[in-house]
Amino acid sequence: MFVKEQPTGSISAGVGYSSNGGLFEASINERNFLGQGINLNATGTLASEEIRGDFSYVNPNFKGSDKELAISLFSQVDDYENSGYQNKKLGTKFATKYEIYEDIFFRPNTVIQYDKLETSGSASNLLKSRAGDFTTTSIGYNFSYDQRDSRFNPTSGTLFYYDQNIATFFSDIPTLQTIVGSTSYKKLYKESFIGSAKIKIANVVAFDEKDVKLSDRIFANTSDLRGFEPRGVGPVDNNDHIGGNNLATLSLKSTFPNPVPESLRANTFLFLDVGNVWGVDYSSTILDSSKIRSTTGIALDIVSPIGPLSFTYSIPLSKASTDKEQNFLFNIGSSF
């Protein structure tokens, strides 16, 4: 018998174009380190106003316990020179995960994070009042219920999760962050039309009459609200989006028969995203639009000889005047 070893590593890169410049992201992933099923991942992001690096270690069966052990390190610098401030954060996260009932998983975690917000003379007075050094120690947990028929391109089933993180002891600003989400999949017509509906709701509040620090504020990412930059929607201070205390999004998607040859091994889908980011606790004068944002578009995923390719084109249907659009997004990956 001849057994061919399958590749367990991958390299991926992504490029985005938006009204605020370009975005480049690259990652290296090894799914079977030392032949023990250990997952190692390193990711770097470079944008006009952001530099971020992440490294994670995940052992799915730590010491034969059937429990997952995950350790991650992260560092990020947000540099908004035109608005006169820079925010740095550095931290680590420890987590474990195990199944408590059939299809129900529990994931407790703890995070230690250090933040440093520096301002210059061009910063607004409100941003200057947010400056300082902050240490945060939080504990959190996640419950998830997963009945999807597949984790890769599912055609039926539901994924539900409830995530909460509490920062109290040894934290300069005590906060509570809650995220609830659900995604359901269903065959709409034969195998060509697979529909999905994704809902996400998030909230963050501070205690002891304090305000949520900038790095804990909520932003909509490109999978929540396509067509906009990851930091391009929500409350604005001195022409910069500062994130909100609340987020709500709804994403509807459906595949359809491929207009490209089958030899390209492609999936195409249409989508409609609706949502908003709102709420500012540290000032009532911040520009905070209640307008519901919505976008529609088309996406194409191709499995090519050089790895998976993803193209997304989005058109905003409704937006606020302060929003930053990102109409086109391209990603490329490879395996080794």
Each language-model region and where it sits:
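C-terminal structured "cap/appendage" subdomains that terminate the fold
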Residues: 279, 284-310, 315-321
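Small/polar (Gly/Ser/Thr/Ala-rich) solvent-exposed segments
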Residues: 9-11, 276-280
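Short glycine/threonine-rich loop-to-helix capping motif typified by GTGT followed
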Residues: 168-176, 280-287
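Short beta-turn/strand-loop junction motif enriched in small, turn-promoting residues
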Residues: 58, 146-150, 167, 183-187, ...
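Hydrophobic, well-ordered secondary-structure elements that form the walls
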Residues: 1, 28, 57, 182, ...
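Extracytoplasmic gating/loop element in the C-terminal half of outer-membrane beta-barrel translocons
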Residues: 191-271, 277-279
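Acidic, glycine-rich loop-and-beta core segments that form the ion-binding/anion-interacting portion
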Residues: 160-167, 173-204
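Gram-negative/organellar outer-membrane beta-barrel architecture
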Residues: 2-161, 175, 193-195, 221-238, ...
